[in-house]
Amino acid sequence: MIYKGLLYKDLFLLKESFPIVALAVLFLLFSITLGFTGGFLALCIMLMVFAVKVVESTLIYDETDGWDSFVLTAPVSRKEIVRSKYLLQILFLTGAFLISAVILLLISLIPVFSGEEWLFLMLVVGFCYALVYGAVMIPIYLKFGQHTSRYVAFAVLIVVAGLYGATFGFTMFLEFAASTIPLLIGVLVLSLAAYGVSYSISQKIYAKREF
């Protein structure tokens, strides 16, 4: 019940951002009609990055409005607050991934898009790197606040984008040979491990934070 209330609060704050998601989906559908599979993949990745960054928005709202000091007067623990942020991020990111995967599956049935299986692989890689970006940014926002973290977020996003591009080039070089699957599994395991470490760090940071 506590998590439901915390998630509802964050969703209420984010309601003005939902039209942006709808606009991204429209661009995505537009790219499909033009046959731009590469553009489709880029928009899918952007959608997942946006899904991750929504938690950054809630952290900024909380800091600006002094929500943390207020909610801690209620029967809500600091661990539950941090946990709700990670849960919200996972829900949004998983939702963005599933939406992209379903649409990709549907368009793969269209003859003009046949032979584009590599998009599925890169979508999974994009999910992993979006997860890593979220894992890095939540503890940074909790530790340094919104002003410093905004610059760090931009730098981290550039690094993650570079890693994604490098993985994309390496995967294309392999031409999706059998060694591609172990690569994807390795990236997924590392991203999940990073997320687990991030959660532990965030809990320690928030437990010591003064309001």
Question: What does each model-found stretch correspond to?
Answer:
Residues 80-82:
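Alpha-helix N-cap/helix-start motif at helix boundaries, enriched for small hydrophobics
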Residues 72-78:
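Short helix-to-coil transition segments within interhelical loops
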Residues 1-66, 84-211:
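Hydrophobic alpha-helical transmembrane segments of membrane proteins
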